[in-house]
Amino acid sequence: MLINGVIIMEMDKRKIKILQAIIHDYIQTAEPVGSRTIAKKYDLGVSSATIRNEMSDLEDMGYLEQLHSSSGRKPSDKGYRLYVDKLMNIQKLSSMEECAIKTHIINSALYEIEKVVREASAILADLTKLTTVVMSPSSIESYIKSIQLIGLDANTVLLVLVIDTGIIKNNVIKLHAKMTIDELVKINRILNIKLNKIRVESINLDFLKVVLEEFKDYEKWLKDILPVLYETLLSGIDSNEIYLEGATNIFNYPEYNDIQRAKDFLSLIDDKDKVKNLIKSDDNITIKIGKENFIEDAKDCTIITAVYKLKDRPLGTIGVIGPTRMPYSRVVSILSTLVDELDKLLKDDNI
């Protein structure tokens, strides 16, 4: 059978419709689905007995699971994978939901990027009713956008570094020699001429020694300023922070009525290293279902992530973690819309 341009050799049209109906029903109800339910609720034009036989075949093919011989069936990881890859139609958001996302992103435009993506994670948790996770940008592949030294008194300046990703770093520098306003202005100009648009990873001690040699007249101040600038620049340079929102949203899902399962989930998301490894991605939208997650603790979860970018350069990841029974179509639609708006904001250089 040809679906979305892809031939599914082992499936006929009737099996596809029955599988779609079962997945749709199970996502909505969280109850194993029987043949009588499908026959009553979905106009498939076949009897309950025929549906039962087809469901048995789908189970043999690995698309469905049956917990008990007397119970209905539910989708397997393989069934969900076929659904999201070939059968799912992306749900269109309401105009109110689209407006809420756009307004939320626009209102966060005055913040630095780390705050913006955390705000995006909060609206994602609110709309999806799932636990959301965001990985903040690393500075290592970024460049310095501006350097500002602000005089606090004759022997003290505040260093403010702005990275092109929107990250802002600051530090207070104590000077051994007093500095006038004119000297402060000149040193600000020197630092911005020499370091502006330079990649962070290119700035090392040798580079700063060259700057010191080139501007000997200002050495008595630069020898205090440059080491602190270097230290400030390197602090957390290659660390992607992980932020979570909506951890208690899992209790909206009956899967987590099981106390042990809920504890396991909360333990998983509390392990930032595990979460970081789980959500790393280079793709626009990535969906990992159940056993596709290589970490054992996440093998009954689905993780849907998207990469947000600065002028087409990947910065970090944002996504959701929840049970394999989740409203995939709606979540993908919300996440896609959110990341599109986030990318527009960053591309417009508003941060």
Swiss-Prot record:
GO terms for biological process: negative regulation of DNA-templated transcription. GO terms for molecular function: DNA binding. It comes from Clostridium tetani (strain Massachusetts / E88). SUPFAM superfamilies: GAF domain-like (SSF55781), Winged helix' DNA-binding domain (SSF46785). Signal peptide: none annotated. This is Heat-inducible transcription repressor HrcA. The keyword Hydrolase does not apply. PANTHER family: HEAT-INDUCIBLE TRANSCRIPTION REPRESSOR HRCA (PTHR34824:SF1). The keyword Phosphoprotein does not apply. Belongs to the HrcA family. Keywords: Repressor, Stress response, Transcription, Transcription regulation. The lineage of its organism: Bacteria, Bacillati, Bacillota, Clostridia, Eubacteriales. Negative regulator of class I heat shock genes (grpE-dnaK-dnaJ and groELS operons). Prevents heat-shock induction of these operons. Gene3D superfamilies: 3.30.450.40, Heat-inducible transcription repressor hrca homolog, domain 3, Winged helix-like DNA-binding domain superfamily/Winged helix DNA-binding domain.
